[in-house]
Amino acid sequence: MTHWFHRNPLKATAPVSFNYYGVVTGPSASKICNDLRSSRARLLELFTDLSCNPEMMKNAADSYFSLLQGFINSLDESTQESKLRYIQNFKWTDTLQGQVPSAQQDAVFELISMGFNVALWYTKYASRLAGKENITEDEAKEVHRSLKIAAGIFKHLKESHLPKLITPAEKGRDLESRLIEAYVIQCQAEAQEVTIARAIELKHAPGLIAALAYETANFYQKADHTLSSLEPAYSAKWRKYLHLKMCFYTAYAYCYHGETLLASDKCGEAIRSLQEAEKLYAKAEALCKEYGETKGPGPTVKPSGHLFFRKLGNLVKNTLEKCQRENGFIYFQKIPTEAPQLELKANYGLVEPIPFEFPPTSVQWTPETLAAFDLTKRPKDDSTKPKPEEEVKPVKEPDIKPQKDTGCYIS
């Protein structure tokens, strides 16, 4: 289902040469610097390469991160940091703040920023794959897995590496914990969307589908709440998307809960549940329009134009009409004024992030190699200020053309 998921832009970064004239005193140190430069450039290239797959991304990321670890961790695995942690200035933009970059003289800042982009790549890969016209079951599983991997990376960055930063992120920057938490939750919610679509296709019990939809709506509500204190200028569009998805899946929950109530001969309550679904679906449609008119980072997706979205509208309408007919012929039950409380708990299909760890330090790092970096030889005028050649150019992301919508993005 092309463009069903909202995506913020990739982070952009200034080139890094890893040239330390005078400091590097041996061939092994020189080789590490060359390998860092080339592996970083290769990883950045893959972010916008449409032929890149998860295996290629993992190999390229592991190659760079294992080398970068030597700038962060001591070789004896003690808690002491590497003497090289603060040797290089790194400069990155943020997904919500346009092309206004942040810079820190800290390899941990680089590790988190690049890791963040790797997680974003997995979300964009999942979105592209979900947009294929005739997606196979294996591809659907890969969409599901990619979103869980992304959630795991974001979670690991937030819990294990953000606390290590010397300079905490400013409000609304990517490395602020609230922002990363919103990405974690969104990835979980979108992975559960795949589960729901699969459950609908396989005609699982309405009670299970209702519970999954309700849990997914709660995820979207939680992500939206996490962003509530950010400036609307850069968060409004993303929040509209989260809000419309919350309304959409709450409508799904009420629709399938209505089917469950009807099966239990509670026709009056079923009608009220479906009326609530109808109201929420209309609200989701209105929010789709508002989302399309809201300015902000990322390309505008069009959920209301998708068959998967429209199918729910037809399902609500037909099921409500069926319940009203049954009530007029058989049950004659009073329709409650209040919508039923959704106290649904899914026992199956809930998404947890796939645990993530950065690779261990490359075997190229030895005590002798580390000793070949002599910090006493740093030039006197070596300053933390970004050099003129470190201009941060926006990432040119490939356009993804919508394909014919089959309405079945996980079959």
Swiss-Prot record:
Protein name: BRO1 domain-containing protein BROX
Family annotation (PROSITE patterns): BRO1
Main location as per UniProt: nucleus
Role: Nuclear envelope-associated factor that is involved in the nuclear envelope ruptures during interphase (NERDI) repair, where it is locally recruited by CHMP5 and reduces cytoskeletal stress through its action on SYN2 to help reseal the ruptured membrane.
Record keywords, A-Z: Acetylation, Lipoprotein, Membrane, Methylation, Nucleus, Prenylation
Family: Belongs to the BROX family.
Quaternary structure, from the entry: Monomer. Interacts with CHMP4B. Interacts with CHMP5: this interaction allows the recruitment of BROX to cellular membranes. Interacts with SYN2; this interaction promotes SYN2 ubiquitination and facilitates the relaxation of mechanical stress imposed by compressive actin fibers at the rupture site.
Gene it is expressed from: BROX
Post-translational modifications: Farnesylation is required for nuclear envelope localization.
Modified residues (Cysteine methyl ester): 408
Species, as recorded: Homo sapiens (Human)
Record lineage: Eukaryota, Metazoa, Chordata, Craniata, Vertebrata
Residues with lipid group (S-farnesyl cysteine): 408
Modified residues (N6-acetyllysine): 283
